[in-house]
């Protein structure tokens, strides 16, 4: 099965003060035979979360470097959809499911790829279920 992961899950796995057993469980699974999909937005959110974590001394430089290695080891595939037609698609998903444009990027990708959605965001998870997308978190 393919999975779309959002940054709430990824950062909860990486930042010590945001640790989540659900994130730990998800990332402890063997994903070698699965696709992990992210919209290009994910990289900006990850960079911002880690940068702010370092700036606010939530993680050390060594932890930052270890996290980069851990994320790099995941079989992440970045979706490259962009352009005005994509903006329209995101707007439709955002409007239909009462999401921000950012959260719509994750749900739109899961819908388009027939993937599950792994998120710790309760609203995004509930809208994914409403859209017929399997969402593992939260329950």
What are these regions (language model features)?
Residues 5, 26-31, 73-74, 92-96, ...:
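Long, hydrophilic "mature protein body" segments
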Residues 22, 45, 89, 126-127:
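Phosphate- and divalent-cation-binding pockets in alpha/beta enzyme and binding domains
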Residues 47-77, 87-89:
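Active-site-proximal, substrate-binding regions of enzyme catalytic domains
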Residues 76-116, 120:
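Active-site neighborhoods of divalent-metal-dependent phosphate/nucleic-acid chemistry enzymes
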């Amino acid at each position: 099965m393919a999975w779309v992961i959002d940054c709430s899950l990824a950062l909860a796995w990486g930042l010590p003060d945001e640790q989540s057993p659900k994130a730990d469980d998800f990332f402890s699974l063997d994903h070698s035979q699965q696709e992990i999909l992210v919209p290009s937005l994910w990289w900006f959110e990850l960079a911002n979360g880690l940068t702010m974590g370092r700036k606010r001394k939530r993680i050390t430089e060594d932890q930052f470097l270890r996290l980069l290695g851990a994320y790099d080891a995941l079989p992440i595939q970045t979706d490259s959809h962009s352009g005005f037609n994509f903006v329209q698609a995101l707007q439709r998903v955002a409007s239909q499911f009462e999401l921000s444009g950012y959260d719509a990027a994750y749900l739109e990708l899961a819908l388009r790829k027939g993937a599950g959605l792994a998120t710790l965001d309760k609203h995004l998870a509930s809208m994914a279920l409403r859209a017929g997308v399997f969402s593992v978190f939260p329950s």
